[in-house]
Each structure stands twice: as C-alpha cells, then as structure tokens.
Amino acid sequence: MKLLSVLALSATATSVLGASIPVDTRAEKFLIELAPGETRWVTEEEKWELKRKGQDFFDITDEEVGFTAAVAQPAIAYPTSIRHADAVNAMIATLSKENMQRDLTKLSSFHNRYYKADFGKQSATWLQEQVQAAINSAGASRYGAKVVSFRHNWAQHSIVATIPGRSPEIVVVGAHQDSINQRSPMTGRAPGADDNGSGSVTILEALRGVLQDQTIVQGKAANTIEFHWYAGEEAGLLGSQAIFANYKQTGKKVKGMLNQDMTGYIKGMVDKGLKVSFGIITDNVNANLTKFVRMVISKYCSIPTIDTRCGYACSDHASANRNGYPSAMVAESPIDLLDPHLHTDSDTIDYLDFDHMIEHAKLIVGFVTELAK
C-alpha cells in the first residue's frame, strides 16, 4: 500500500490505445499504468523510485493483448438490512488476538516476503499451511473446502481458499502477503508487520471464525466464499491482477470483494487526538458495495468510520475493479495517518494494536456471512 502523494510525473505517458510502445531491450523493462490509459516503460529500479515517492501503479507487462479495463460493473443488489446477527456474533466470539499475535510474530520473522525472493516463497508456503490447518480443523475439507496455490512466473505464489456454497457466485476477502524494503527489495530486511502482515493474519483469523459456522462449512451457504492472499502487490498488484484476470477470462462471477491492506496501526489517529476509526476508501471502489460495508461496520464493530481516498492502483481491490468486479477497501485509518514505518525494516509488530485488528476481523466475518449466507 502507499502513503498518498501527488506527483508531477515528468516523463511522457503513453496511451494504451495509442501506437506501439518501443521497448529498450538493453535492460529488463516493465510496462506500468499510472492512471487510466497512461503508461510508461520503466526499469525495476525506476518502479521502486516511483514507490518511494508515493506513486502507485499497475504493472501490466504480462497483461493479455487486447485487454480492456472494465468501465462498468454489473448491477448487484446488496442486502439493505442485517439478516444473520446471531450467526455472526457467535463467530465473532471465537476470534482470538492471541492467534493473530502468534501468526504475525511468525510471518514477520521471515527476513522479507519479497515476491522474487526465496523468503517470499517460504513465507507463502508457511501461510498456506496455516490456511490448510484451519480448513482441516473445521472438518470443512469433507464438504469440498480447499486451499490451492495460484502460481506465477516469480517465486512467491498467491493463495486461494475456497468454501463452496450452493451457488458458484463468489464472495471474496483478500489481502496481500508480500513485503518490501524499498531501499533494498531483494535482500533488505522487511518484516512487513503492518504492510501487510496485519491484513494477512487478520483475514486468516476471520477465516477461522467463519469456519465455526456449520451451515457455511457444510456448503449450505447461498454463495461460495473465497479468501485470497496475493503475491507481488508491492510490485504493481501483480498477484491480484493475475487472479482477477483469470476469473474474468473464465467467466467467474464475483458478488463482491473486500480488501484488507494494513489493519493494525492507530498511533497516527491517537497522536492527532482523533477517535480511532476505520478508513473507508471512497475512490476506485464500488459505491453500493461500500454502502453495504458501512452497514456491516455499524452493526458488528465498535469503532466509527472516516472517509478517505487512496489513489489509483493503491491496493488489490483495484485489480478486482479493473476486471469488472465490485470491490471495497477498509484501511486501518485515514490514508494520511497510516503507519509511517511501512516499506522499511522498522515495520514491526511493536507498533500495532491487536484490538484494532480484531475490529477488522469482525468486519470480515460480518461481510462474508451477510453477503454469502
């Protein structure tokens, strides 16, 4: 994720719809999209320099020829009232800060989780093992629940856990699993406790909570549920782009996607004398799904919301949106008060508040159950 900033980009951006773009073959280059239709070929170091300046982007180098970003999304009717309070509250009661502390301590102990590094592969393998253990513990595999690796052409794989429902229409919760030290991406220490170890373990704990409901475990929910952990977000939303492009190509229907990127830092709000709140992202999201998310928060969470904007391609919900799937994003705080330690070796567990992370987990359980059950 990013700290929002406005940049004056000096290099000429080229329209996707324009003439062919020459590639400098003297060094590996990547095609990035900085805004709708504005692209540029850059080296990997130039990508990191943009990120250091607060500029996010899609890396569309491997995008299918002829791909067109969605300009409209199907009209989906979302619930306008809470229908499953008893079930959700029972699941929420099982959520554990201790589980999240244990998981995040381990996840942030990898030297880094860079998507091209062996550490990124190792951390993804460990994380998938925890997801599999949650499914096994709930007995959900007997009813078709599973977790699979979504492979890419780099070391770290994405992870997709599926709990089948009566309909193939999918309710998705996602978080990116990779981390980065922007000064030294491949070898630098990048614990990534908040960005985005916090989101990764938050949705893992929410998965455990959801798997306490036997209607869901036994495949009797109305819709299918998926939990995603994306590889390569920091390099241009690579893993989530690959997954949602695949879903688009294969005709999968997604009812809604909720993204969780950074869920644990509250000091910025506290230092400003503000009430600790969720940051509701209002740009590059689906307005109707976001309205539904607000309703879920008001029912199941104990903190209020603040509207905030995070810019183009700021996190993985943008990949769903780009492929025509409705998405929403809830951050730990307003964007201008996010954790200042992100992308450094100082992004450690010491700065995080697990009560705040539990609030995010409560949101996820409510979102999934009210939309899928």
UniProtKB/Swiss-Prot annotation:
Details of cofactor binding: Binds 2 Zn(2+) ions per subunit.
Single Gene Ontology MF annotation: metal ion binding
Signal sequence coordinates: 1-18
GO cellular component: extracellular region
Pfam families the record matches: Peptidase_M28
Enzyme class at the top of the EC tree: hydrolase
Cystine connections: 310-314
Binding positions for Zn(2+) 1 per the UniProt entry: 176, 195, 261
Subcellular localization, as worded in the UniProt entry: Secreted
Keywords for this protein: Aminopeptidase, Disulfide bond, Glycoprotein, Hydrolase, Metal-binding, Protease, Secreted, Signal, Virulence, Zinc
InterPro entries associated with the record: M28_fam, Peptidase_M28
Names of the cofactor(s): Zn(2+)
GO annotation (BP), single: proteolysis
Glycan-carrying positions: 196, 288
EC code: 3.4.11.-
CDD domains: M28_AAP
Positions annotated to bind Zn(2+) 2: 195, 234, 343
Function: Extracellular aminopeptidase which contributes to pathogenicity.
Subunit structure: Monomer.
Protein family per UniProt: Belongs to the peptidase M28 family. M28E subfamily.
Descriptive protein name: Probable leucine aminopeptidase 1
